[in-house]
């Protein structure tokens, strides 16, 4: 249940209720020792109507003020610096996104996040909102796009001025047999790999790519061996790291 004070969750373990407020979330993130602490916000569905999106943004802005009050009145617990990143919201409405970006830019945080995208809206609308927001957010602070995305999404985000990303896709899709490669997507459950004893990816970015064959990895998935999940996750994470390293090289060279 969500209200002005915060959000009440019911434990899936014992049914107990727990209230998360902006203040409590800041305290938890201090205790965790997060290098980057994220503001407490509402991530409204991408299909939200305008009035709900506007109401949600107002709540997120009020919660942000409470987050900064708590953050500024507490100290790191473990002797190293922690940063608080506010989160731009506003669904797919340009005026709300502009309002949110301007409000957050005024906070002069050490970095800023863009949230509430890749949550059901069309991909082109996501790119449009990134452009709207990054016209406003300062260029000398990291701009972090939350929960995105596919390799193409990441390159398109970089093109539009995004500096940081996070996403479950490399590991979640990997656990389901999907490998991202330099030559496209491979579904390792497919029968086509059954007798393919070539390396997973001969020019891949990870040591697992030449250590195991495609046929063996397919066998592991069909045998429901946990090793399959590990190999696929390692491969996909290495691919994503290779992708952004290549993007960085081309940015520095001026030919991205």
Language-model regions, residue ranges each:
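Non-catalytic, usually N-terminal nucleic-acid engagement modules in DNA/RNA processing proteins
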Residues: 1-77, 186, 190-194, 222
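Glycine- and acidic
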Residues: 46-50, 54, 111-117, 226-229
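Glycine-rich phosphate/ribose-binding loops and adjacent secondary-structure elements
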Residues: 58-61, 70, 74, 83-200
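C-terminal extensions of enzymes
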Residues: 41-47, 201-256
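Structural signal for hydrophobic packing residues in well-ordered secondary-structure cores
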Residues: 33, 64, 68-71, 75, ...
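Electropositive phosphate-/nucleotide-binding environments in soluble metabolic enzymes
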Residues: 19, 23, 54-61, 94, ...
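Residue-level signal for inorganic ion chemistry
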Residues: 29, 104, 254
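Alpha-helical packing segments of well-folded alpha/beta enzyme cores
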Residues: 25, 56, 60-63, 67, ...
């Amino acid at each position: 249940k969500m209200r002005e004070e915060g959000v009440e969750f019911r434990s899936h373990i014992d049914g107990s209720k727990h209230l998360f407020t902006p203040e409590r979330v800041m305290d938890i993130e201090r205790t965790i020792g997060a290098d980057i602490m994220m503001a407490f916000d509402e991530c409204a569905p991408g299909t939200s109507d305008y009035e709900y999106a506007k109401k949600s943004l107002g709540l997120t802005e009020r919660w942000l003020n409470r987050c900064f009050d708590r953050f500024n009145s507490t100290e790191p617990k473990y002797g190293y610096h922690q940063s608080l990143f506010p989160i731009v919201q506003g669904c797919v409405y340009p005026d709300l996104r502009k309002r949110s970006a301007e409000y957050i830019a005024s906070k002069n945080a050490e970095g800023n996040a863009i949230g509430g995208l890749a949550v059901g809206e069309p991909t082109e609308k996501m790119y449009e909102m990134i452009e709207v927001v990054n016209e406003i957010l300062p260029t000398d602070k990291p701009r972090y796009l939350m929960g995105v995305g596919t390799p193409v999404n990441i390159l398109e985000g970089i093109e539009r001025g995004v500096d940081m990303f996070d996403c479950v896709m490399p590991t979640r899709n990997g656990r389901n047999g999907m490998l991202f490669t330099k030559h496209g997507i491979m579904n390792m459950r497919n029968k086509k790999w059954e007798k393919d004893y070539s390396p997973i990816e001969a020019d891949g970015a990870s040591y697992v790519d030449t250590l195991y064959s495609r046929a063996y990895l397919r066998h592991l998935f069909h045998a429901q061996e946990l090793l399959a999940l590990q190999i696929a996750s390692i491969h996909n994470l290495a691919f994503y790291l290779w992708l952004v390293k290549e993007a960085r090289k081309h940015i520095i060279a001026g030919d991205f």
